[in-house]
Curated annotation (Swiss-Prot):
NCBIfam families: frr (TIGR00496). This is Ribosome-recycling factor. InterPro entries: Ribosome_recyc_fac, Ribosome_recyc_fac_dom, RRF_sf. It comes from the Bacteria. Pfam families: RRF. It comes from Salinispora tropica (strain ATCC BAA-916 / DSM 44818 / JCM 13857 / NBRC 105044 / CNB-440).
Length: 185
């Protein structure tokens, strides 16, 4: 019972970390990457579809992105969605593809993005701690019901705390890495 609870908690914490990595990937740095377009959704014949499912996204240069739609009739819709997004970029429509030159980020914008990264990191830490809280409640319930001994319960709680600290440390590393990436000129 204890092993199952700890295993489930670890899986949920790993999912929280994966979600945080996705969120960090969508934060724009001074460098181009395909993940920054993952949150952009286009209305494709009535159904909202993420941009990466509708086009190939290439990064030929550090500050340039080329988006080649699979269906060229959607190029204008993609251009509008990118322009309306919070990325602050202006795509050039070349008919069969979109070319996006990323402007150099200002110091103010970098600081703003660092705040966003820290906020996303705190959200990930809260998610990890919530998983810990739920797992601890389950462990307490098992001890109270007499399904496991108190010593085993305390040992499992210590393992849970170690697990939580490890994942919170991982989030801290992700934040540090993203900050360094954002401060790089």
């Amino acid at each position: 019972m204890i092993d199952e609870t700890l295993l489930e908690a670890e899986e949920k914490m790993e999912r929280a970390i994966e979600h945080a990595k996705e969120e960090f990937g969508a934060i724009r740095t001074g460098r181009a990457n395909a993940a920054m377009f993952s949150k952009i959704v286009i209305d494709y014949y009535g159904s909202p579809t993420p941009l990466p499912q509708m086009a190939s996204i290439g990064v030929p240069e550090p500050r340039m992105v080329i988006i080649k739609p699979y269906d060229t009739s959607q190029t204008n819709a993609m251009e509008k969605a990118i322009r309306d997004s919070d990325l602050g970029v202006n795509p050039n429509n070349e008919g069969n593809q979109l070319r996006i030159l990323l402007p150099q980020m200002t110091e103010e914008r970098r600081r703003e993005m660092i705040k966003v990264a820290r906020h996303k990191g705190e959200e990930a830490k809260v998610a990890v701690r919530n998983v810990r809280r739920k797992a601890k409640e389950e462990l307490d319930r098992l001890v109270k019901a007499g399904e496991v001994g108190e010593d085993d319960g305390r040992r499992a709680e210590k393992e849970l705390d170690d697990l939580t600290q490890r994942f919170v440390g991982t989030v801290d590393e992700l934040i540090k890495h993203k900050e360094a990436e954002l401060l790089e000129v």
